[in-house]
Design a protein with these regions (language model features):
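Noncatalytic luminal/extracellular "stalk/propeptide" segments of secretory-pathway proteins
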Residues: 22-44, 51, 63-183, 214, ...
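Second-shell loop/turn segments in exported
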Residues: 44-52, 66-75, 144-149, 183-190, ...
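His/Asp/Glu-rich mid-to-C-terminal helical/loop segments that flank catalytic regions of hydrolases
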Residues: 392, 453, 506, 521-580, ...
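Metal-dependent peptidase/peptidase-like ectodomains
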Residues: 119, 232-296, 344, 398-537, ...
């Protein structure tokens, strides 16, 4: 999962007082989805829950879980799973471990050598630090590598490609530089690491090296470890480079990786890279980059190393060798249920427990908070509280290699989840600072309401208001500030595929949230041996007060979701978000039409030739066909229907609550809840996205060339990115039909609720 960049926020006392006034709730206003009577009782249980969360317990959970390396297939990975299972059982959950068998390669041989014009061998190892005892667990640590890199042994000239995205290769084209037959070196950042070898291979490169530049997470940002919290000169970011065609086990797409599952051969697995890849430290990168010549890299390509950044190719000539043990390994998902009075509806909560090494931040900070939530839910249950809906806590294994545990579990239980799942709430890393949340916007009003009830440990204002004010301070322009101020809700970001929410949102069509705190910690050791208890307790959430805030936030959300009379959804923010996605498509089309028209004019005028510096020659950009008209009317019309249906449901819910939420039979409420649970499934199309059929959701999906980053309405957007305008246009009516189906589902729920209110 990606980590927070450091941001700073100053909050004036006047802003604080105004914020407090704005966020005060009217006592008589019931919670979303609750009757007035149920709302008051609910808030009492929620306050008991929040009061019972103990930071010292979260600290102890982290100390235990991160004590040793616990990657997939390691002894401590299984030991942690069994310990987590024992805790859930101790707290009164009905708990079990579900085991899957997945492909998980580990390194056998790794070589990066500079052969010409000088000789150098990369260390490819993070050193033991005397001040950090955990770093000495070398026998149990995974070496520095990129999982799912194909085996390979290649020697070639080196080319620097910045972050290695498609736009970077377009820039190389302008410089007249080809990577065909070369080994590329890219710096981490600006998207999923697996995109770097993918694009390099498509451009003809035969190998890929990825390094951590100090401008991204090293001494450029602050003192490096152990004096400060930032990545040291020999620190390396491990990570998967699996392609984005589908997440999960590469050999069992679309089915759970059980013992009986039919498996692809490794040769036929589409998500394994086409060229060999290795990560290196910035110390190992300096000798390689220093021996490049050719054009000086553009300004925005230059990192924080004390060298002149050249692009190449050569004269640096590099030997890259990768060989792995391609073995099947067991993964252990811990699934724990607190049964509700209605076992037919499920609220799910998850965080992964595996790590690349010790993983105090990623993922143990989130997992430790999850366990404290579960402990306190068990305590409430002993005091007499029983949730209406069943609550399922999930400690996933195998997230780091490619969301293996959550994907295989969802694929195995897909039919049950589609029938019973109300929502899924995810966490991963948790740090110090501001509330961050993403997800499906039908839960935007809900999570905003929850966040108003949680106190920020540094300011004592609500975490909702502190995050909102921070967003205003760091808004990119006046328009963004205006947009933030015009909304009473916390604006959810759109999720791609950075963590275990992916299968729930993109494959199963389940309403989803992912929640974290961050932005104020003093450094990062992302996927390094130094991401351990010693580092975390010095430089991140020292007193675990933000671990408590995370547990309070998500635990409150879980209780509120589980107890609501009606599933607490509000579709208006979702309709607004989808309208924004559609407007972005129209803007992209208009911008491309303008860009290509202007480019063709400048080519015709000879402007590029006239502006070319003969001492630093560049190649003119290619002639592009100006995009034709695209008919967005079907989608715009469908979105109008969606807005009207969302408004209708909001009015029906308000009327139900205004009438005192008359007592009705459980069966009638359950019928409406069944309607509501079905709505997010209507975003799915069984055929999936055009080039990636595993991804079923037609609104929410990661980009094929972004990974972590979302590409809303991907069926249209990605054809536009490929300049396949006719194909993009053909997708619009199909997406419009999906949106109309969603509107129809919301209208059904609204009509049933209107009927219920009229009856009483």
């Amino acid at each position: 999962m990606s980590f927070w960049g450091v941001v700073f926020c100053a909050i004036l006392s006047g802003q604080f007082l105004a914020a407090q006034a704005k966020e005060e709730k009217t006592p008589s206003t019931p919670l979303l989805g609750y009757s007035s009577q149920a709302s008051e009782k609910e808030q009492g249980w929620e306050q008991k829950f929040r009061d019972g969360i103990v930071p010292a317990n979260i600290r102890e959970n982290m100390r235990r879980l991160s004590a040793r390396p616990h990657h997939v297939g390691s002894p401590y990975d299984k030991d942690n799973a069994e310990w987590i299972l024992s805790k859930f059982k101790e707290w009164g959950f009905d708990a079990r471990i579900e085991t899957f068998n997945v492909l998980f390669p580990t390194p056998k041989e790794r070589v990066v050598e500079l052969l010409e014009p000088t000789k150098f061998s990369a260390k490819l190892q993070e050193p033991v630090l005397p001040s950090d005892a955990t770093s000495s667990q070398t026998a149990q640590q995974l070496p520095t590598y990129n999982a799912y890199s194909i085996d390979g042994d290649v020697t070639a000239p080196l080319v620097y490609v910045n972050h290695g995205n498609r736009e970077d290769y377009d820039r190389l084209d302008r410089l007249g530089i080809s990577v065909k037959g070369a080994i590329v070196i890219a710096r981490y950042g600006e998207g999923w690491r697996g995109i770097k070898p993918k694009v390099a291979g498509e451009r003809g490169a035969i190998g890929c090296i990825i390094y951590s530049d100090p401008k991204g997470d090293g001494y450029y940002r602050g003192d490096d470890y152990p004096e400060g919290g930032w990545r040291p000169r020999l620190g390396v970011q491990r990570g998967s480079v699996m392609d984005t065609d589908y997440p999960g086990d590469p050999l069992t797409p679309g089915v759970g990786a059980t013992a009986e599952a039919k498996r692809l051969t490794i040769r036929d697995a589409k998500t394994i890279t086409k060229i060999p890849v290795l990560p290196i430290s910035y110390s190992d990168a300096v000798p390689l980059l220093s021996e490049l010549r050719g054009p000086v890299a553009p300004d925005e390509w230059r990192g924080g190393l004390p060298i002149t950044y050249h692009v190449g190719p050569g004269p640096a000539k590099v030997h890259l060798k990768v060989s792995s043990n391609w073995e099947m390994k067991p993964i252990y998902d811990v699934i724990a249920t607190l049964h509700g009075s209605d076992d037919n509806e499920w609220v799910l909560r998850g965080n992964h427990h595996d790590a690349w090494v010790n993983g105090a931040d990623d993922p143990v900070s989130g997992q430790s908070a999850l366990l404290e939530e579960a402990r306190m839910l068990g305590e409430l249950h002993r005091q007499g509280w029983q949730p209406k809906r069943s609550i399922i806590y999930c400690a996933w294994d195998g997230e780091e290699p490619g969301l293996l545990g959550s994907v295989e579990w969802v694929e195995t239980h897909l039919d049950e989840l589609k029938k019973h799942a109300v929502a899924y709430i995810n966490s991963d890393s948790n740090e110090r600072g501001f509330l961050g949340a993403g997800g499906t916007q039908d839960l935007q009003s809900f999570i905003s309401s929850v966040a108003r009830d949680i106190r920020d440990p540094e300011t004592n204002m609500s975490v909702f208001q502190r995050s909102r004010l921070n967003s205003i301070v760091h808004a990119k322009d006046a328009e963004e500030r205006k947009n933030i101020r015009s909304h009473n809700d916390f604006l959810l970001s759109t999720l791609g595929d950075g963590s275990d929410y992916t299968a729930f949102q993109d494959y199963a069509g389940i309403s989803t949230l992912s929640v974290e705190f961050g932005g104020e910690n003093d450094g990062t050791q992302y996927h390094s041996i130094y991401d351990d208890f010693y580092w975390y307790t010095r430089f991140v959430d020292t007193d675990f007060v933000y671990g408590r805030a995370l547990a309070q936030t998500i635990g409150t959300a879980i209780i509120r979701l589980a107890d609501a009379d009606l599933v607490p959804v509000d579709y208006s923010p979702q309709a607004e978000a989808i309208a924004k996605y559609e407007a972005e498509l129209e803007k992209i089309l208009k911008d491309k039409q303008d860009e290509f028209t202007e480019r063709d004019l400048e080519l015709h005028e000879g402007a590029f030739a006239a502006a070319n510096d003969p001492r630093r020659p560049t190649v003119p950009p290619p002639v592009e066909v100006v995009p034709p008209y695209m008919n967005f009317a079907p989608m715009k019309n469908a979105i109008e229907l969606l807005k009207k249906s969302a408004e209708r449901y909001s009015k029906a819910l308000a009327a139900w609550q205004r009438e005192g939420s008359p007592a009705v039979s459980v069966d009638k409420l359950q019928a409406i809840n069944t309607d509501l649970i079905a709505v997010p499934r209507l975003f799915l199309a069984e055929k999936g996205l055009p080039a990636r059929p595993w991804f079923k959701n037609q609104i929410y999906a990661p980009g094929a060339y972004t990974g972590y980053g979302a590409k809303p309405i991907a069926a249209v957007r990605e054809y536009m990115d490929e300049k396949k305008w006719k194909e993009a246009d053909a997708q619009i009516p199909q997406v419009a039909q999906v949106i109309e189906n969603v509107a129809g589902g919301i209208n059904k729920a609204a009509a049933d609720l209107e009927s219920l209110t009229r009856e009483h």
